[in-house]
Amino acid sequence: MNILCFGDSNTYGYRPDGTGRFDEKTRWTYLLQKKFGNRHRIIEEGLCGRTTIFSDAFREGRRGLDQIGITIETHNPIDLLILMLGTNDCKTHFNASSKTIAKGLIQVIEKAKKYSSQPFELLIISPIHLGNGVGDDDFDPEFDLASEQVSRQLAQEYRKVATHYHAGFLDASKIALPSEIDREHLDESGHAALADAIYKTITESGLLEKGMDSSFCHIA
């Protein structure tokens, strides 16, 4: 079965020290594939700076809503869609609330449904929190204190979205913390912990088993 992982820099595997990308064997997507073996195929679609619906004047092509359709079509058929977005939506210049970001996530889901060649199961992951002081000098000036607060409110809103769609849900902030190096991205241990948690969530919730049973309600 095909599992599409659609996210931002923490799906891409951006290194907290700013030196590029973690090697494949460090990233949570690879670790998840290793756990599943050849039973399922993990499709990695992470992009640094990706948002749900917001266009970033400083970085072209980061709006998830513009990309999810063609991504789905590229990899069809999709059996399970894993979405982990929202961190970049917390940037100061977007001035978005957690409720607004959750509405953006819904738009992404609806577009995915439109372009999918078949009904799919859905796992919504609320991202790790932004670390305290992420907007301080020498860190990331695109964030501020309000950004930190919004990131801490995402899980509550995303859980509501998951309930609405009868989807799986995982709060990554309960699993991992951002690296102390940049207060924003997962380190090696964070990737490993997230892979473990996602695997556990998928297997214990029976998401893939639902996908094989036509009697279950899929996202369509």
Where are these regions (language model features)?
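Alpha-helical cap/lid subdomain in secreted, periplasmic
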Residues: 38, 62-220
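N-terminal start-of-chain detector that recognizes signal peptides
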Residues: 14-16, 52-55, 140-142, 156-158
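Serine-esterase "nucleophile elbow" of acetyl-processing enzymes
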Residues: 1-47, 53-58, 71-75, 81, ...
